[in-house]
Amino acid sequence: MPNRQLKFKWLRLLFIIVLFIGICFRVINIDKKVYWHDEAYTSLRIAGYTMKEFAQGAYAHPDSSIKYLQTFQQFKPGSQLRDTIHSLAVEDSQHPPLYYVLLRFWVELFGNHVTTIRSLSILFSFLAFPCMYWLCWELFQSPLVAWVAIALLAVSPVHVLFAQEARQYALWTVTILAASASLLRAMRLNTKWNWIAYAVTLSASLYTFFLSGLLAIGHGIYVFVIEKYRLSKKAIAYLFSWSLGFLIFVPWILSLIQNYSMFQMTTGWTNNSLSLFIFSRRWLLNLGHIFFDLGLEKDPEFMAIYFILLVLIVYAFYFLIRHAPLKVWLFVVTLIGATTLPLLLPDLIKGGQRSIVPRYLFPCYLGVQLAVAYLVSQKISKPKLFWQTIWQAIAVLLILGGIISCTISSQANTWWIKEISYSNPQVAAVLNRANRPLIIATNGCINNGNLLSLSYLLEPKVRLRLVDIAPLAQVPQNSGDTFIYGDCTEPVRDSITKKKGYKLEPILPYLWQLKSRD
C-alpha cells in the first residue's frame, strides 16, 4: 500500500506538469492565428452592430480603405448592452447571449485588442480543469481517473484550439462539465440546494449554446433509467430542476421562435450533403483530433494513426461498459448519444453535415475523454507488470501526441479551425504586395465576415468596393490591381469575363485577379 501511494504521488506530479504544459499552450501566441470570420462576427455583436448596419456602412463608403471596416469591430457610439443582445436576437439567435454579454463587459474593462478578446476564452478553458476533476470524482470517485482526464484535456489539440477562439465554446465546455457534475451531486445528496445548483448550471449552459438542450435530454434519460423509470423523489426533483432551467431560458426560446427564419438561414449550410467518403473521413478526423492533430496538410499522411485512435476509443467504450457500474457507463453513453445521434441521424437519413461540425461535438469529445481516462487509469493500475508497462506507454504516447500537435499548431498563423478563413493570411499577403489594390466583393454569403477578418491583416492602401450579388453594369476603373474576392461572386465574375478586354486569373480560394486580355 505505501508503494502504491508513492506511485500515485509521482503520477500526480507528472499530471500536474502536463497540466502546466497545457496551460502554456493556451496562452502562447494567442494573437498569431488569423482573427477569422466567426470571431469577427463576435466583435461585431459585442460592439452593438448588426450585419445590416455593416452592409449599409460599407455601401456608403465605396472604394474606401478596407481599414474602414474596423469601425464595426469597435463599440458603436452610444451602444449599450441591449444592442449586443438585440444584434444576436434578430440576426444570429443560434448563439444565446451569455458569452457575448460577459465578453462585452470584459472588453469594456480591458480593451478591444485581439489578445484581450481571446483571453476570456482562455480563462474559461482554465475553469474546465477543476470542473473535469469534479465530474470525474462524482462519476468514478477516483482521483487517478480525474487526473488522467485532466491530463488528456490539458493537451487535447481540439480543446487548446478552441480555448484560443473568441467564441463561446470554451465556456460551453465548462457549463457542460459543471451541469453534469451538478446533476450527479444532486442525485447523490438529493438536497434542494443541489438541485437548484443543477438548474442554474443547466440554464447557464443553455444560455451559452442552444445544443445544451440535447445535453438536458441526455441527463433526463440517465436519471429515469437509473431510477428504473419510476417517478421517484429524485426523478421529480430532476423534473423540477429541468423545468426551472428551461423556464430561465424561455426568453431566448421566444426570441428564437420570433426570428426562426433567420435561424434557418444562418444554419442552413448544415443541410448541404457530403459524399460518404468525405463524411466518414471528417468523423474520423474529428475523433482523432481529440488526441492528435498536425493540420490539414499533414492529416492524409497520418490516417493510420487516426484509425488506431478510433480502435482505442471503441475499446475504451467496450471496457467501460464491461467493467464499470451501470450508473457510470450509462452517464458517459447518454452524454454522447443524446447530443450526437440527433445530429448524426438526420445526416445519414436526409443528408447534411450537422454531426461533423467540430464545435457541435464538445459533449462527445468530453465523453470520449472520460471513457479513455477510465480505461488508462484502470490499465496502469493492473497488478501485472507487463500490461501495466504497455498501458503506461500508451498513456505517454497519447499525451506526447497532444504535446507535439499543440507545439506545431501554436506556431501557425492559420489552422483547420479557421475553416472558411483558412486562406486569409495568404490572401492578405497577395493583396498587400499588389499595386493600389481594389477588392470587389459581394454583399452576403460568407463574404462580410471574411472581409472583417481581412481588415485585421490588410494595409490601409487596400480599398474595397461592396456590390450586390448580380452582374456588374460596368467594371470599376482602377489604376492599380483589381481583385474579385469572396463566395457567391459568380454573377460578378461571369459579367466581367463576358466583357471585351478582361479576363480573371484564379489566385487563391475566393480570390481572382482582373487582367487585361492584351
Task: Go through each PLM region and give its residues.
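Hydrophobic/aromatic-rich transmembrane helices and adjacent perimembrane loops
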Residues: 330, 352-383
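Specific aromatic-rich, kink-prone transmembrane helix
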Residues: 105, 131, 151-155, 171-189, ...
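Catalytic lumenal/periplasmic loop and adjoining terminal transmembrane helix
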Residues: 385-513
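Interfacial juxtamembrane loops and adjacent helix segments
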Residues: 47-95, 99, 107-109
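Perimembrane helix-loop-helix junctions
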Residues: 182-198, 202, 214-246
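Transmembrane alpha-helix segments characteristic
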Residues: 202, 243-244, 307-312, 323-348, ...
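Transmembrane-helix motifs of polytopic, lipid-linked glycan transferases
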Residues: 119-140, 178, 318-319
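Transmembrane-helix signature of polytopic, membrane-embedded enzymes
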Residues: 132-155
